[in-house]
């Protein structure tokens, strides 16, 4: 990890800008300002902005940031933010998992989950794709999501056995390998594939990989408009990220060499036709597979540094908006890229950390030897 030194002058500059940025949750586009800042300065600017404003963000966003910062740094102060996430998802798992045997519950809650997809172009495409699989959203984006996160923290959640039984009885393969589904949300599907294997309810990896490659053959890249090209690249990064337990473990590059080779060959189009979060993930894909010296990493870093706006102390959205709630994802990714550690940290296993152990929700039970278990 870089040794990040800050002069007093820089610190006061950042602090002053942070105080200004605390009111910057702009809904209107902001004009980005050019700069000559270093990677270190960009890293600290984003960090100061996010951590100053963290408690104004939704619990889900606080948890997302804290989990990733713990896995990058191992600093236990980030365990408290992760605890906020656990408290939230444990209550939700209790509601969903403990009602699975209630007549009509799966059908009604699945419909609610689908309705939340929205009515924009992407939401409509996803609703159309998921129509043949009416219960898939509940199984995947609710049950698998919450159970896998509880598991990552070293616990089993409420009504665990009923949830596992329900998911084992649900054949997710048709939805996961459907071409329209992959075209609608490739990255999310590989997440579901990983989570299903993680909690022991099904191994869909090879089937999904084959379906993904058939959906996006490299020979037909020239036929992909920007939206579909972004979806392809985003999906490819998540093959690697899911294999890492989402930044908990280094990844053997051999299984994913087909992805790394593709990124290296197509980096110029990736930099042109995708967005900052996807571009940053491409760079991280090389770092997490031990390929930090690959020229792609330097290209991505230069792009990300140039995308930083010093006035708002963040990387703006593709539409130029400075909303921290929706922009935390791309900005914490930028932090990770610019200060990648020598060692990744598992968990956090909240039952093993003094500051969180005494505040755990009663709804979860510690797993045996969680800290000694590789979840995948």
Task: Label every model-predicted segment.
Residues 26-119, 132-152, 162-172, 294-376:
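Terminal, non-catalytic domain-edge segments
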Residues 273-281, 325-332:
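Amphipathic alpha-helical protein-interaction segments enriched in hydrophobic
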Residues 13-14, 24:
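Cleavable N-terminal signal peptides
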Residues 2-13:
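Bacterial N-terminal signal peptides that target proteins for export
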